[in-house]
């Protein structure tokens, strides 16, 4: 990779690193796992960057790589760890980027998102980023109509989790 390409990558990564943190919060439930996943996603982005063609926004491409990496690692770890009740093992998450008044709500939201399946997690995060259905469909590789249907189901599922 050329120095100019490296600088461009570093700049884009810096501007969009919150995307990686959001994906990590949805697929991990503790700080060490969050850091490990963040590092793995960054490595995968670095490896894949020379193949980035610019046909979509960098952030859209970044989401796709981040989700694929998270899902892949999540599935691998699922095979290695005995399944337990997720809610029993969740600890309060700390979010240093937000003021104290929003911590509890944000923690509850991320716990709810954490309990969703892989596609639903991705949909919820992209929705929270105000992505259009077109952008969501491109990021996840599904049709726009399918994105709308899945999004409505995911919203309903989240409402039921948050307001039992």
What do the PLM-derived regions correspond to, one by one?
Residues 41, 65, 123-124, 136-137, ...:
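Hydrophobic positions on the alpha-helical face of helix-turn-helix-like DNA-binding modules
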Residues 2-3, 42-57, 76-77:
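Sigma70-family region 2
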Residues 140-164:
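DNA-recognition helix of helix-turn-helix
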Residues 115-135, 139:
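Short amphipathic alpha helix immediately N-terminal
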């Amino acid at each position: 990779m050329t120095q100019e390409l490296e600088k461009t990558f570093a700049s884009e990564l810096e501007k969009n690193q919150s995307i990686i943190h959001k994906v990590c919060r949805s697929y991990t439930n503790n700080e060490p796992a969050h850091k490990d996943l963040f590092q793995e996603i960054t490595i995968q982005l670095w490896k894949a960057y020379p193949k980035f063609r610019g046909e979509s926004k960098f952030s859209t491409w970044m989401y796709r790589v981040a989700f694929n990496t998270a899902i892949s690692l999540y599935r691998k770890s699922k095979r290695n760890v005995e399944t337990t009740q997720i809610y029993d093992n969740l600890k309060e998450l700390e979010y240093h980027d937000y003021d104290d008044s929003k911590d509890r709500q944000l923690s509850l939201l991320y716990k709810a998102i954490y309990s969703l399946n892989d596609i639903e997690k991705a949909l919820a995060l992209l929705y929270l980023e105000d992505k259009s259905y077109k952008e969501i469909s491109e990021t996840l590789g599904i049709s726009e109509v399918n994105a709308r249907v899945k999004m409505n189901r995911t919203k309903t599922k989240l409402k039921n989790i948050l307001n039992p």
